[in-house]
Swiss-Prot record:
Keyword Hydrolase: yes
Name by which UniProt lists this protein: GTP cyclohydrolase 1
Keyword Metal-binding: yes
Protein family membership: Belongs to the GTP cyclohydrolase I family.
Keyword terms, alphabetized: GTP-binding, Hydrolase, Metal-binding, Nucleotide-binding, One-carbon metabolism, Zinc
Pfam families per UniProt: GTP_cyclohydroI
Organism per entry: Azotobacter vinelandii (strain DJ / ATCC BAA-1303)
One GO BP annotation of this record: one-carbon metabolic process
Amino acid sequence: MSLEQQYTAILAQLGEDVSREGLVDTPKRAAKAMQYLCRGYQQTLEEVVNGALFSSDNSEMVMVKNIELYSLCEHHMLPFIGKAHVAYLPNGKVLGLSKVARIVDMFARRLQIQENLTRQIAEAVEQVTGASGVGVVIEAQHMCMMMRGVEKQNSTLVTSVMLGHFRSNTATRSEFLSLIK
């Protein structure tokens, strides 16, 4: 059964008239939207980075902050929306600037929990760059908590993963955290 057919079945199960004007193309649109929102499954880290790794003598912190992200909670398939802050300490190589955002998007465009998303991003940046440390903080609002359940409209989940010097060196961690404020 195709994704489109499954959306038709869901609408019918909800009691909707799937032949009414406003819903005629909804299953097709919903299937296309879901495929787009989950396109990270069709991407690999190698494809996303695409060789954009450059030699550099810089060993100071490199950070991209306020990277918008949109993902779907794996428990309810509802969106969570937020921003990621990603930093690393180069160890002879720097990553093309847009590639940090593309790594975030690749993992965010999968059914996820934010805790795992944060770790996947950190480990991918570490793997690709060979950095001596990586820090990732994600702040996001979860529709599964805002639209249903406890219905808390102003809640934000904050997660962090610190690897290498970001974990072992308090000054590095503090510098990173102060830069994202």
